[in-house]
């Protein structure tokens, strides 16, 4: 179908963030790699070098970049994949009406204009990053990640601060490609990188690396379109998402996903069960292993980087949820529970798990083992159903590892603060330190409309305790499908949580940006304050609501305190006077009864 004829080519947000430019650091082992980072320039009066930060926005934030959504992004990794000599191109499966929910005519989203033959592993080969790591091979993806995780640390080594409690995580001062290989080989980290998604920039998920965040997008049977979902993906990447999950449940799932993957610099995850359910017209009881298997291959050929598989929902666990306040809240979990009860047999996901591993191994699709029995209310947190499923996920992890498949484990959910650490400790023990990937958790149930905050609290805590990736929650959680603005709010909230966790864990480069912003704040460099923040646009707009003039951008006060009550301005005055008179003279002055301090013995006791 001619995409131009229907005039629906989406437009997406492009252009650099304020005072920022993209820089690239080359590889040593693989000199052809170029690792992107964002350099934030500071005002000349600061006397400070630019601040380098992690950047996952792809080409969309390059000044003057020629972005053509109908052409997709450059296939960054394709030559790396082909050079290994263990893959082959093949015809692949044909798109069928059920792949797009039987949409037709004007309701059918057009196919992506340029499709290439998919790749798969040659017979007997494992093309996963785990297989390469176990064989002692440092892939270009691994070196790319090592450079990316260092955040330019070689140049900033003297300014690094090590301060925190890591709860057993071992974050090195300098990440090497060999360290990345070792962590992947041990199963403590994954590199979600399907051989059919060469547009994605390599990233890593593991507790000995920076805490990552995921943003969920996707249409529903009620609302949204391909153009909106592609823009949501780009928008999420712009504000700092590390991966995106396409959780579409309506029509056009196949074609929308193709547009997203071809334009995504981020790994893309899915829940294949959702599309499989659409193929049987939404009737859970009609699901079969054959339909599900076909869906896995379909999505793997497109380039999905990780699958959420709810294989831990077993028939004999379902009665454990009967007395819960909120039952089974996972969509995938409830679908499989309904199927198991109707057929009164074990889940086909559990029974065919080794075959699922064989498919994932063929394309290097990572597992995200789903928590289908996660608690949906704090009353249900840490119950028998939740932890029974976790034990099964630990068993499945060992099976996947034996097949050279990469694995992370999904976690809750709704958990009050005092029960969060138990989740992390159990997961590490039961799942062999496979990376933990949690939805929040939400720490209270009383705040619909503010669940990005209730969950951000839990996310910061569990990230500190060792969770490797945090799945964002938006203000629309429990209320509706997030729009573009909700996506940004969710991403920024979770960037805060992830960064707070990195600080608490003692990540050596985490505090550099905080300190740079604090110095800018103390020195009243307003533009630097805005530009160093996670959301420069919002910071600037809040300031300008009350002090909009350009002259206010150099003022030594804000509208909160005004010029006479600004604590930082008073601190400057104290410093200036101290430098003028000398600290000792100042101390003597105060001891003699200065205007700031009163001797303790001069204070009259209270009458009571």
UniProtKB/Swiss-Prot annotation:
Enzyme category, top tier: lyase
Complex and partners: Homodimer.
Catalytic activity: 5-amino-1-(5-phospho-beta-D-ribosyl)imidazole + S-adenosyl-L-methionine = 4-amino-2-methyl-5-(phosphooxymethyl)pyrimidine + CO + 5'-deoxyadenosine + formate + L-methionine + 3 H(+)
Family: Belongs to the ThiC family.
Primary role: Catalyzes the synthesis of the hydroxymethylpyrimidine phosphate (HMP-P) moiety of thiamine from aminoimidazole ribotide (AIR) in a radical S-adenosyl-L-methionine (SAM)-dependent reaction.
Stored Pfam families: ThiC-associated, ThiC_Rad_SAM
Residues annotated to bind substrate: 216, 245, 274, 310, 330-332, 371-374, 410, 437
Name of the protein in question: Phosphomethylpyrimidine synthase
GO cellular component: cytosol
Keyword Disulfide bond annotated: no
Pathway connected to this protein: Cofactor biosynthesis; thiamine diphosphate biosynthesis
Chain sites annotated for binding Zn(2+): 414, 478
GO biological process: thiamine biosynthetic process; thiamine diphosphate biosynthetic process
Cofactor note (record): Binds 1 [4Fe-4S] cluster per subunit. The cluster is coordinated with 3 cysteines and an exchangeable S-adenosyl-L-methionine.
UniProtKB keywords: 4Fe-4S, Iron, Iron-sulfur, Lyase, Metal-binding, S-adenosyl-L-methionine, Thiamine biosynthesis, Zinc
Cofactor names: [4Fe-4S] cluster
One Gene Ontology term of the molecular function aspect: zinc ion binding
Transmembrane segments: none
Residues binding [4Fe-4S] cluster, per UniProt: 558, 561, 566
Organism: Rhizobium rhizogenes (strain K84 / ATCC BAA-868) (Agrobacterium radiobacter)
Enzyme Commission number(s): 4.1.99.17
